[in-house]
C-alpha cells in the first residue's frame, strides 16, 4: 500500500495571510454556532423531562448511547472534512451544507408532536442523535478546523482562535442569561415557547453561518498525492 504524502499548497494565488474581514467572519460564525449549541445542550434535557415527560430510564439510555455514538461520528467527520475537495476549500463548504440543517434540527428538537409517549420517545431519540451526534458534529469539526486552512501563520491562527473564543464566550453568556428570562416571561411549561425561541435562535444561527461562509476564505489546503483526489 502506498503511503500518503501530505503537502501544503495554496488554494489561491493570494498570500496565505488572512484579512481582518476573514478573521471577523470566523468570529461571526461562532455567534451562530455556539448560540444554537448552547440552547440545544442546555435546554434539551429540561424539555425532554419537564415538557415531554419522557421516562428517566429511556433518557439515561439515550444520553449514554449518544455519547458512545459521538466517538464514531467525531472521527468519521474529521476524516470526511479533511478529504473534502471543492471550489470553496475543505472546511468552508460545511458551513453552507450543515449550518442550515443545524437550524432545522434545533427547532425540531423542541417540537412536541401529538403521538403518545412511545411515539415521543422515538421522535425525541431520533432528533437527539441526529442533532447532537451527526448534524452538529458535521459543522463543529470543520468550523474549528478553519483557522488552520485560513492561514499558515501560527500567530495569525492564534489571533483567529482568540478572537473567536471571545465571541463564543460572549454569545454563550447571553443565551444563558436570556433563555431563562424568556421562559419565565412567556411560560416555562409551554412547549410552544421552547419551539419558537429555538426557531428564533435557529434563524439567527443560520444567518451567522451564511455570513461567515461569505467572509471566510481558505488560503491553505492539504493535497494528498495518493490516492489522487480532485485538486483543491
Give the ranges of each region predicted by the language model:
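Single conserved hydrophobic/aromatic residue that forms the stacking wall/gate
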Residues: 224-232
Amino acid at each position: 500500500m502506498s503511503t500518503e504524502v501530505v503537502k501544503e499548497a495554496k488554494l489561491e494565488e493570494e498570500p496565505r495571510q488572512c484579512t481582518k474581514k476573514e478573521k471577523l467572519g470566523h468570529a461571526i460564525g461562532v455567534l451562530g454556532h455556539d448560540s444554537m449549541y448552547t440552547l440545544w445542550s442546555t435546554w434539551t434535557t429540561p424539555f425532554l423531562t419537564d415538557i415531554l415527560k419522557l421516562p428517566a430510564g429511556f433518557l439515561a439510555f439515550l444520553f449514554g448511547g449518544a455519547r458512545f455514538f459521538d466517538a464514531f461520528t467525531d472521527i468519521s467527520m474529521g476524516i470526511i472534512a479533511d478529504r473534502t475537495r471543492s471550489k470553496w476549500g475543505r472546511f468552508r463548504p460545511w458551513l453552507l451544507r450543515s449550518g442550515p440543517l443545524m437550524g432545522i434540527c434545533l427547532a425540531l428538537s423542541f417540537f412536541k408532536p401529538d403521538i403518545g409517549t412511545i411515539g415521543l420517545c422515538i421522535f425525541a431519540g431520533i432528533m437527539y442523535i441526529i442533532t447532537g451526534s451527526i448534524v452538529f458534529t458535521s459543522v463543529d469539526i470543520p468550523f474549528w478546523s478553519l483557522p488552520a486552512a485560513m492561514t499558515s501563520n501560527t500567530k495569525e491562527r492564534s489571533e483567529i482562535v482568540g478572537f473567536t473564543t471571545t465571541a463564543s464566550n460572549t454569545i454563550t453568556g447571553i443565551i444563558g442569561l436570556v433563555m431563562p428570562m424568556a421562559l419565565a416571561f412567556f411560560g416555562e411549561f409551554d412547549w410552544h415557547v421552547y419551539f419558537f425561541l429555538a426557531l428564533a435562535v435557529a434563524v439567527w444561527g443560520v444567518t451567522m453561518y451564511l455570513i461567515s461562509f461569505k467572509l471566510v476564505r481558505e488560503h491553505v489546503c492539504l493535497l494528498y498525492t495518493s490516492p489522487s483526489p480532485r485538486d483543491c
